[in-house]
């Protein structure tokens, strides 16, 4: 279904369509608003699909890292995870806060009071996490 915000957009579109077209029949108004609502549903569907793909990729990557550690192919005692955002004008505050964060291999990232083992931090998140070798303290 649609988010509360999207339902509000559809309601406002209905009111505007009725106001702007007082001579239209109810059927014509309904047809126009239905097309608009269906377009919003397509947008919502794409957001859900992108986010679920990001969750699946993040979970798969984490499972792979854990298996590599279990098999002794990487040493989690010298590995960290790094959160990598897309530092542009579309990056949200949470992702901006997480960008460049480094945590121990088996720990969570924290931003704005929430914790994340890996991406995504929210719907449509474009961030990724990667495993890095822990930097030696000098």
Where are these regions (language model features)?
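Domain-core detector
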Residues: 1-124, 130-138
């Amino acid at each position: 279904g649609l988010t509360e915000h999207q339902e509000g957009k559809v309601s406002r579109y209905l009111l505007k369509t009725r106001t702007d077209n007082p001579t239209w029949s109810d059927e014509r108004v309904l047809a126009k608003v239905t097309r608009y609502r269906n377009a919003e549903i397509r947008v919502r569907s794409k957001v859900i699909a992108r986010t679920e793909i990001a969750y699946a990729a993040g979970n798969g990557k984490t499972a792979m890292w854990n298996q590599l550690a279990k098999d002794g192919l990487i040493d989690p005692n010298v590995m960290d995870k790094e959160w990598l955002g897309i530092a542009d004008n579309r990056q949200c505050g949470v992702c901006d806060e997480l960008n460049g964060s480094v945590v121990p291999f088996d720990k969570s990232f924290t931003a704005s009071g929430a914790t994340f083992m890996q991406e995504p931090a929210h719907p449509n998140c474009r961030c990724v996490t990667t495993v890095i070798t822990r930097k030696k303290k000098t």
